[in-house]
Regions:
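Glycine-centered flexibility motif
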Residues: 31, 79-80, 100, 120-121, ...
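Short, electropositive, low-hydrophobicity segments enriched in small/polar residues
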Residues: 35, 39, 45, 69, ...
Length: 156
């Protein structure tokens, strides 16, 4: 049964302050690392809402040629990390951004028992929502960030 009335119980999303970004922040960035928790194999709704507001940047081509990478966290190893990373990448491809992943030259990628994918960095938080990265996750996350920074500097 669906109610005819709806009452907001959560506060509205703030319009400014960390970790929130504006369209001007995106327009002026030299590279973008975009992250979201996984929600049923997709990015979280607030990030989707924000990306849906970037049409003016898409129309102007403001993000074309800028490097970007994506990262996520899930509660379980098979919680939808790769589909989440892909769902975050699709709008960035539409913007003409240069998506960076993790190559298998990083041996941790093929040996990890926790997070890490070629599509982007990931973390398995577990059912206890552990915020601490495993050694493999930390190494791969730093490698992706380093890769993004290196490419952004080369393109600047």
């Amino acid at each position: 049964m669906v109610s005819a009335q709806c009452e907001a119980v959560d506060p509205q999303i703030p319009h400014e302050g960390p970790p929130y970004a504006t369209l001007d922040d995106l327009k002026s960035c030299h590279g973008l690392a975009l992250g979201s928790p996984t929600r049923f194999g997709n990015m979280a709704a607030p990030l989707k809402y924000f990306l849906d507001s970037t049409t003016s940047l898409w129309l102007s081509g403001a993000l074309v040629g800028k490097p970007a990478c994506v990262f996520t966290s899930t509660a379980s190893m098979h919680g939808g990390q790769e589909t989440t990373l892909t769902s975050m990448s699709i709008p960035l491809w539409h913007h003409g951004m240069l998506l960076l992943g993790l190559p298998y030259t990083h041996t941790e990628l093929s040996e990890t028992l926790t997070g890490g994918t070629p599509y982007g960095a990931s973390h398995v938080a577990g059912s206890d929502n552990n915020p601490h990265l495993s050694q493999d996750e930390s190494t791969l996350t730093k490698a992706l960030g380093r890769r993004l920074a290196d490419i952004a500097l080369k393109l600047k």
